[in-house]
UniProtKB/Swiss-Prot annotation:
The gene is RPS11. GO terms for molecular function: structural constituent of ribosome. Keywords: Mitochondrion, Ribonucleoprotein, Ribosomal protein. One of its GO terms (biological process) is translation. This is Small ribosomal subunit protein uS11m.
Length: 128
């Protein structure tokens, strides 16, 4: 008697592309996933993961935020992303490394940090 293998029906997942915006400030790292039109799909920051106060600005926190967003995006059907980086904080490189660890394919990395050409006066230096 022949026994047929039961065919497992695979859920059809549309392979989506998206844009990941990384804004790295001195106090926090904000990571947003948008679709190609610019509509926000997911948002993760170091603060939403439970890091508080000065721990939000660490390199580890930004990497953890990127990994959390990447796993959410992969489960939702995103496969390829474009990364846009903005800001002068510490967490830029570790956030990119966190995205590279995931199964998402990074097509392009863009630096979109605005650079002032003698515009507004910068804030005064800290005296500690």
């Amino acid at each position: 008697m022949l026994v047929k293998k039961s065919q497992i029906s695979r859920k059809f997942i549309e392979k989506k592309s998206g844009i990941v915006h990384i804004q790295s400030t001195t106090n926090n790292t904000l990571i947003t996933l948008t679709d190609l039109e610019g509509n926000t799909q997911f948002f993760v920051s170091a603060g939403t993961l439970g890091f508080k106060n000065s721990r939000k600005s660490t390199v580890y926190a930004s990497g953890a935020a990127a990994e959390a967003l990447a796993s959410k995006a992969f489960n939702e059907g995103y496969r390829t992303i474009i990364v846009k980086i903005k800001g002068l904080g510490y967490g830029k490189k570790s956030a990119i490394r966190g995205l590279q660890k995931s199964n998402l394919v990074i097509k392009q990395i863009q630096e979109v940090t605005p650079i002032a050409h003698n515009g507004c006066r910068p804030p005064k230096k800290r005296r500690v």
